[in-house]
A protein has these predicted regions:
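Gly/Ser-rich oxyanion-binding loop with an adjacent helix/lid
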Residues: 43, 57-59
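Acyltransferase donor/substrate-recognition loop-hinge adjacent to the catalytic core
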Residues: 60, 86, 109-113
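Conserved active-site and cofactor/substrate-binding residues in soluble primary-metabolism enzymes
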Residues: 16, 20, 30, 34, ...
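Catalytic core of soluble alpha/beta enzymes
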Residues: 97, 102-177
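Flexible hinge/switch segments at interdomain interfaces of large molecular machines
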Residues: 17, 59-65
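Metal- or metallocofactor-binding catalytic centers and their adjacent structured scaffolds
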Residues: 1-50
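Active-site beta->alpha loop and helix N-cap motifs at the rims of alpha/beta catalytic domains
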Residues: 49, 53, 63-97, 101-105
């Protein structure tokens, strides 16, 4: 939030000056990439709305040939997860689900009651024991999961390596990088 407090766009009267605005935003800090991305996305969304067209049309892209992206379902109650899944299931080809709590299996069963779309998992470093992580990955594979992101705490590099070697699914690092 501190980064966003630095952003003052009053000097720009035209939101279509995307390159100038985003260069200014980028110059405010060498880091804060998530906050910069939020400004970038909001600005592009505004311009798209002003033009009355989605960006794939503005850029002349064929939506059917555009690479897929995921819709992320965060950690929440089963009712909220069910509602979010229903909301996005017909608009995305793959879901990304945040796990790493005691009710992980319940969350997956809730999603599976709504859709059979492929699912990528981000365990958010939530599985502390490597055998538990591996057991979860085997169970998740049976549920149509296609990949696992950051299953264990980033400090447990040896355990992450062990899980990665044993896993029937691809395992990716995030916080470990």
């Amino acid at each position: 939030m501190n980064f966003l407090k630095k952003v003052n766009l009053e000097q720009f009267s035209d939101p279509f000056q995307l390159e100038d605005i985003l260069s200014y935003v980028d110059s405010l800090s060498p880091k804060d990439t998530a906050a910069k991305a939020a400004v970038d996305i909001a600005l592009h969304d505004l311009v798209g709305k002003l033009l009355g067209a989605p960006w794939h049309k503005i850029w002349g892209l064929n939506k059917e040939k555009t690479p897929s992206t995921t819709f992320t379902i965060g950690i929440d109650t089963p009712d909220v997860v069910r509602a979010k899944t229903k909301e996005c299931a017909d608009r995305f080809n793959i879901l990304k689900v945040k796990l790493g709590r005691d009710n992980d299996k319940e969350m997956i069963e809730t999603i599976r009651s709504v859709t059979d779309l492929p699912i990528a998992i981000d365990a958010n470093q939530g599985w502390k024991d490597r055998q538990y992580a591996l057991d979860m990955i085997h169970w998740l594979k049976e549920k149509g999961i296609v990949m696992i992101e950051q299953p264990m705490p980033k400090e447990q590099l040896d355990d992450i390596a062990w899980v990665t070697l044993q896993s029937p699914l691809p395992v990716f690092a995030d916080e470990s990088l």
